[in-house]
Amino acid sequence: MSLNLRPEPLVRRIVATMVVVATTVSIGAVASSASPSTHSANRTVDYVQQLQSALTAAATQSTLPVNVTPPTSSWSQLWSDYGLPSVQTSCWDVAKTLDTIPKCVMGSHNATRTIVLAGDSQAFMWTPAFDAWGKANHVKVVVLTKAACQPWPDAHQSYYDGSTFPQCGVFQRAVVAKINSLHPAFVVVAGLAPQWPTGYCASCTSSQRLGMVSADVKAFISSIRASRAHVAVIEASPDFYTLASTHPLTDPLCLSAHPTSVQTCNSTPLSQLQNSLMKMALTSSALPKGVVVVPLDKLLCSAVSCPMVVGSRLVLSDNDHVSTQWAQYVVPAFTQIVNALHIN
């Protein structure tokens, strides 16, 4: 039995055909008209709360608008626009066979303060926001990511299709060595649970699986102790794959299938979309002392649901990855969350 019961979406993509509804609550004026520096300076504005209001309102929207971001003509090509296109080639190690460290720097290239963003696609999907935040806060962001290769080492790691994946272990060790030699101020890390071979741990209990994944996470954190960096772990994102096998409306294709009842797709309860295993493994109580959790899930879900679209913008590019446009749009709220943790 495989731990991750879904294909790696950036390699075997179920392309999202998403459309969007007009919401009665908008943060567009905030996110589109103000510069990142203005976002940091104007601390009286609660961008996270504004975004939460928009996410909540989206659950009750019904009809599709004419204009969407990105445009409908690009829906079948969202995978090629994943992350920042200008740096994708040098930053994103997609091929299974590659195990080299990407040469990727975002944010403020000449800054004296450096952080590392490490992990799999769950880390890379936030690069548009980290890039804007780094530029505004004079922080260099070194990105060390590989598709389908979570940052935490696991002796039974396999590829999403169940095949052997030795390149992931090589990449993981190279990332650790790079971090320990770089001595960044912070390491921000994100990733899914390791993919296990078919049949492995088939009779394991949920508690046993959690114990194994938690041990993997702690092993990674321990391995970069020599860097003396502070460590921040990004909260697990919502995962529509958790219901894909039993619920026909959880795939983002739901939106194009229900043009006059988008609320059917936008109102899935948060409790049904949480990656419970990773959420438990990445809670403050389960992590070593001093490690902080970055609640970026607040940029994707309200307290009760996780809409696929908000206003005229796609939230997700597939079942569990943030669209590039949404990651750019929520920079004000992203900045508020990250700066509150003193990562800057």
Question: What residue spans do the PLM features occupy?
Answer:
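Extracellular/periplasmic envelope-modification machinery, especially enzymes
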Residues: 2-344
